[in-house]
Every structure is written in C-alpha cells, then in structure tokens.
C-alpha cells in the first residue's frame, strides 16, 4: 500500500484524482491539500464536489509546509498551477517521494520555453533534465524508472496519440505540416470563476492562435512542426481534435489502419474506430482516447477525442502511476 498526497485537490482534476485513487486497492490517500491561501481550505471535498458525497467526505487541508506534508508519503500528485508545481516538486522529490506533476512545469526540457510560454525562469534544470514525459502509451519504459513524471497536457495527449503512429511509420508527407484544430470544454480553463468561462459569456471561439503553449509541447515531443489552433467550446468537458495531414504518395487507407493497429493493439486506453470517427459523448467521463480517420487520395483527416480531465489529465496520471509501480495499467480506471 502506497501513501499518496494530492495537492490542488479542490480543482476539477484534483477531484477526479481523488475519486480514482480512493478506489485504488494499492493506494492510501493520506491527505487532500490546497494552497494555504485557498478559499477552499478546510472545506469538505464533497461539499466542493457533491458527486463525491458518501465517497470521500474529508476536508481539504491548507499546505503550509511541504517538507512536513511529505513525511510518510510515497507518491505525490500535483494538480497545481505551473509555477506552484515548479516550486513544490523539488521539495517532495528531495524527501524521496515519486511525483506526478499535472502542470506544464517539467514537460519540455528547454529553459527558454518556460520564459516564453509560461512567463517564469525555470530554477531547477537538474530536475527538468531528469523529468520523464508521461505519454503513457509511448513512454512506459521510461516512466518505470522515473521519480518525476510530467503528465502531458490535455491537447498534446490527443494530438500525439493521433499523430505518432503515422510519423513513426513515415506515412506523412513532411512538405505539409499537420494542422490540428482542437476544441475543449470550459473545464479546461479550471474551476476559478472568470468572465471568459461564465455561463452567459461562453461561446465557441478560437484562442491562442500561433502562440498557445501546447503547440511547442506537441512539436517538441513529436519531432515535427504542427499548426495548432485551440478553440473554447460551449460545453463542460471533453476535447475533440480534427487533424488534417498529407500522406506520402502511394499510402493507402489500409496502411494508415495498420499503423494505428500496430501501435495500439495492446494499449487498453486507446480505442480505434474501423469505421467512422468518434464523438465527444463516447469519451466524456471515461479514461479513453478514441481515434478514427478517413483517407481521400493523399489527404488524411484524423479525429481524436478524450475527456480533458481524465485521459487529458487525471486518468493519464493514474495510468502512469500504475505503470511506474507495476500495477495493472488500468487499475481503478475501468
């Protein structure tokens, strides 16, 4: 039994983590924590998230001393802001904890990336170099050896799962960059109230055109440039990505299908569509990434869907934890 701590437990992702870990037979939640300044400190998590009533009726505690909080803890999940994770992770790591960071603080091993896209100077180059990028289906062997696992972003998870089999099989024409048009539910903006995500203001609209921080995350880990345009959808949760690519001359629909099958036939949390393409309703509330595609000559359109809070965050973090400690990969997830 592993003692685990969730920091940032009051948010949407933190609540999903609590639910998964509470029912995991190998995990013991020692505490649910939030920042010392949080207005949620001291409240029951089941009051903040009523779906947890009768399941997890414990208070979220203020984190005032990370070194003290780390005592007796084996595993820490950080569902916190990027700069908060940047500051907290090294403290828990120094205490010997294995850390799963759901922020962007350790995803890209390039200090300039953090200055440009996150607005802070990265102060922990050693941990940045040691961090393993937790794209579970592709980095399992590295995850097994890691102390710090940087859980991928929600958009990058779906994009990479959709594109990596095609790139590895050299099916795409490099003369045309993949074009990713992605839509996310409002929960991707977090639980904190703002004008952008208020009920009367929410609309279907693009944002972060040519400067969203997930574009370089996707490009870096795929090893190829992409054009990525995120959109805010007028729904609560889920991500749908429509990806347009150009195939190498002579590549067929069967070649594409075989590339996906070879990559994911033994990956339980990626579901492939033989016919048609997935819809959001098929993944919301579930830990899967669903992928379908269509070919017309040298043109390929791939559609990938996931729940942004689950496969795009909490479920992938728990999946990585299962891989790291040798548990069944889908334990507590399905």
Swiss-Prot record:
Disulfide bonds: none annotated. Keywords: Amino-acid biosynthesis, Arginine biosynthesis, Cytoplasm, NADP, Oxidoreductase. The keyword Cytoplasm applies. Its EC number is 1.2.1.38. It is an enzyme of class 1 (oxidoreductase). It is found in: Cytoplasm. The keyword Cytoplasm applies. CDD domains: AGPR_1_C, AGPR_1_N. Pathway: Amino-acid biosynthesis; L-arginine biosynthesis; N(2)-acetyl-L-ornithine from L-glutamate: step 3/4. The active site is at residue 154. One of its GO terms (molecular function) is N-acetyl-gamma-glutamyl-phosphate reductase activity. InterPro entries: AGPR_AS, AGPR_type-1, NAD(P)-bd_dom_sf, NAGSA_dehydrogenase, Semialdehyde_DH_NAD-bd. NCBIfam families: argC. Belongs to the NAGSA dehydrogenase family. Type 1 subfamily. This is N-acetyl-gamma-glutamyl-phosphate reductase. It comes from Pectobacterium carotovorum subsp. carotovorum (strain PC1). The lineage of its organism: Bacteria, Pseudomonadati, Pseudomonadota, Gammaproteobacteria, Enterobacterales.
